[in-house]
Amino acid sequence: MIQEQVNSIIVLNKRKEVNDMMFIPGNIPSLKNSKVKTSRGIFSSPTVSKFLRSIGIQGFNSRKKTVKGYVDPTRPNQFEALRSVFMAMKYGKGDPLVIGYHQVRNSKRLFDFSNSVEIIQDLMTAHDFIEDDNVKHVFPVPMSKEGLLINPDDPRAFPLYSVDKENPGVWIKLF
């Protein structure tokens, strides 16, 4: 089932004729604002844990570059499945990578752009898609759903995020 979703995302990318973009499904939570403090330590919130489980990840550590997936073959790591797409997009581009993000949210709730891309960049680091998510290696920028950057003459020419209750996620493009 999950592999079918990944395949349909890749097909969707081809159908849109935007081979230089990829889509990560799910309403992307804020990692920074989703910490739960307990007597045993600080942990990710249930929202973050639910998102990670939905893409086949039990846990990860971006500093150690480790990702713990599920043994169950019906729950593959969907992020890892996008490695070849990401590496093809990255080919020939040097550091720092300028990574465009277009958030597709499941509601009109306000969100913080920088916090919402933090978990994606941490996952990219943990999966070793990028060396690190600091400014030496990565600059995150908002973009349109079609993969266009902001026009300095008309910065509000198009929406930099959208709402789709049925298909939330994030479009990613490397510039």
Where are these regions (language model features)?
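Acidic, proline/glycine-enriched N-terminal capping motif
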Residues: M1-F175
